[in-house]
């Protein structure tokens, strides 16, 4: 059964598309059962985070469109909307993908550790739903081993290197008394969540989260001991902000120059650090013309992030090598497992032949037939039955000139190649002798006539 990894992530799809395919954690068990029954899958696991939705699945066929069709139907999403953002990884690429994801090599933030916990959650949910078999079980264990080795043997997670971290670092350069400061975060997506996390780690005094969807703002605020509000409340609460970080998907500015100007006056011209991470921009660029406003965009942070990325390229290269090593180990296990299944099947067939032939021999003996002749019949019949299938395969390979297949068969059956060649030469000599004798006989017959 082929293995697939099917889904989308932060590189292939915007937040709006990712949200449409995200699975509710409480309903994931039912979704797993549905995926298994409707696609005919042998095994299935679903990884759903704010950055990605991925289905790892073993199918009895090679058509991933069945899974894509199930996914869009189950999530009630228009296939045309999400199809351009989906990727399909097959076999070895699917194995490699899960290992890279688990190690943080496919994350928005290179090497971020949170993804490993999310992969483990996906594994446990699939196991609890009875949707894991030997193949996915072993694959997840190899993925966990990769993540652990990458953490232990490389510096991939030594320092956070994200736009969010760079933003907070820059804010701290302006305010050295962070515990006394208030941050207003506009938006509630992954980037803002990372900003909130780093602000908390740096000891920010208070966090206010403004978002069009207040429920999402509440969830984010509660996770960081903050306060939520709607975008309509933002102008009224903006004067409280020492730090403003905005990242929404709005096509128009959220904060105009006039709103910022009124907030600065209400603050009695105390400095305000503003970072606009959105594209298109959330904050009118004219707001940065005021003396007390320090307005930056994501482009102003790229240098910091790129420098940190360069400093960790060696670690990333080491991590990729670890992934490749584990992919090889997993493939070795898969091949050994597949061979084991073939061996068990072959032995089962041989034992079935033996039982049937033995039963026939017993009936012959019960009829009083000569035991020696029965033994001769038994050995001849059993040998013929056991070698029939390999013989048919060898003849088919010989007929097509497939020498590689013949060589593999000889090695598998432990047949000496030199013995085969000597036997072939002997057959040729015998045939030549027979041809010569026939020719002499023809001459004798001609002379005697």
From Swiss-Prot:
Keyword entries, A-Z: NADP, Oxidoreductase, Porphyrin biosynthesis
Gene Ontology annotations of biological process type = protoporphyrinogen IX biosynthetic process from glutamate
Catalytic reactions on record: (S)-4-amino-5-oxopentanoate + tRNA(Glu) + NADP(+) = L-glutamyl-tRNA(Glu) + NADPH + H(+)
Q: Determine if Oxidoreductase is one of this entry's keywords.
A: yes
Listed pathway(s): Porphyrin-containing compound metabolism; protoporphyrin-IX biosynthesis; 5-aminolevulinate from L-glutamyl-tRNA(Glu): step 1/2
* Site feature Important for activity, where: 97
- Segment forming the signal sequence: none
The molecular function GO annotations come to: glutamyl-tRNA reductase activity; NADP binding
- Annotated substrate binding lies at 49-52, 107, 112-114, 118
**Which residues participate directly in catalysis?**
50
Name the top EC class.
oxidoreductase
**What Pfam families does its record include?**
GlutR_dimer, GlutR_N, Shikimate_DH
Q: Which positions bind NADP(+)? A: 187-192
| Keyword Cell wall biogenesis/degradation in annotation | no
Extract the Gene3D superfamilies matched here: Glutamyl-tRNA reductase, N-terminal domain, NAD(P)-binding Rossmann-like Domain
Return the EC number. Answer: 1.2.1.70
Compositionally biased, Basic and acidic residues: which spans? 440-449
Region entry Disordered, spans: 418-449
What does the record give as the function of this protein? Catalyzes the NADPH-dependent reduction of glutamyl-tRNA(Glu) to glutamate 1-semialdehyde (GSA).
Subunit structure of this chain's protein: Homodimer.
Q: What is known of its domains?
A: Possesses an unusual extended V-shaped dimeric structure with each monomer consisting of three distinct domains arranged along a curved 'spinal' alpha-helix. The N-terminal catalytic domain specifically recognizes the glutamate moiety of the substrate. The second domain is the NADPH-binding domain, and the third C-terminal domain is responsible for dimerization.
Any other noteworthy remark? During catalysis, the active site Cys acts as a nucleophile attacking the alpha-carbonyl group of tRNA-bound glutamate with the formation of a thioester intermediate between enzyme and glutamate, and the concomitant release of tRNA(Glu). The thioester intermediate is finally reduced by direct hydride transfer from NADPH, to form the product GSA.
Q: Which family does it belong to?
A: Belongs to the glutamyl-tRNA reductase family.
Q: What is this protein called?
A: Glutamyl-tRNA reductase
Q: What taxonomic lineage is listed for the species of origin?
A: Bacteria, Pseudomonadati, Pseudomonadota, Gammaproteobacteria, Chromatiales
């Amino acid at each position: 059964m082929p293995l697939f990894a099917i889904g989308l992530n932060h590189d292939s799809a915007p937040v709006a598309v990712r949200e449409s395919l995200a699975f509710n954690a409480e309903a994931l068990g039912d979704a797993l059962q549905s995926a298994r029954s409707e696609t005919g899958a042998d095994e299935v696991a679903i990884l759903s985070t704010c950055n990605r939705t991925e289905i790892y699945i073993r199918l009895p066929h090679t058509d991933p469109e069945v899974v894509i069709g199930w996914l869009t139907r189950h999530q009630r999403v228009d296939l045309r909307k999400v199809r351009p953002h989906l990727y399909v990884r097959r076999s070895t690429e699917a194995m490699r993908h899960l290992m890279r994801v688990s190690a943080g090599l496919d994350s928005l933030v290179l090497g971020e550790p949170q993804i490993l916990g999310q992969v483990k959650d996906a594994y446990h949910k699939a196991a609890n739903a009875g949707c894991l078999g030997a193949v996915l079980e072993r694959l997840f264990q190899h993925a966990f081993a990769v993540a652990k080795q990458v953490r232990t043997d490389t510096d991939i997670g030594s320092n956070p290197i994200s736009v969010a971290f760079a933003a907070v670092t820059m804010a701290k350069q302006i305010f050295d008394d962070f515990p006394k400061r208030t941050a207003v975060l506009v938006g509630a997506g992954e980037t803002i969540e990372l900003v909130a996390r780093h602000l908390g780690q740096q000891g920010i005094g208070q966090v206010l989260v403004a978002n069009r969807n207040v429920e999402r703002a509440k969830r984010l605020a509660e996770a960081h001991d903050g306060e939520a509000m709607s975008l309509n409340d933002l102008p009224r609460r903006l004067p409280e902000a020492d730090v403003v970080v905005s990242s929404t998907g709005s096509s128009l500015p959220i904060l105009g120059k006039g709103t910022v100007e009124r907030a600065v006056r209400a603050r009695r011209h105390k400095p305000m650090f503003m970072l606009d991470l959105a594209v298109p921009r959330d904050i009118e660029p004219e707001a940065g013309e005021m003396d007390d406003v320090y307005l930056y965009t994501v482009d102003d942070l790229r240098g910091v992030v790129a420098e940190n990325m360069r400093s960790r390229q060696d670690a990333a290269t080491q991590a990729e090598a670890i992934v490749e090593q584990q992919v090889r180990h997993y493939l070795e296990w898969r091949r050994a497992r597949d061979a084991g299944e073939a061996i068990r099947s072959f032995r089962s067939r041989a034992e079935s032949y033996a039982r049937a032939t033995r039963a026939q021999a017993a009936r012959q003996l019960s009829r009083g037939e000569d035991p020696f002749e029965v033994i001769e019949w038994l050995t001849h019949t059993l040998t013929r039955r056991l070698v029939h299938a390999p013989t048919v395969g060898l003849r088919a390979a010989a007929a097509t000139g497939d020498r590689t297949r013949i060589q593999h068969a000889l090695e598998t059956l432990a047949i000496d190649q030199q013995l085969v060649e000597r036997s072939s030469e002997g057959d040729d000599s015998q045939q030549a002798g027979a041809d010569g004798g026939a020719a002499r006989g023809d001459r004798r017959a001609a002379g005697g006539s």
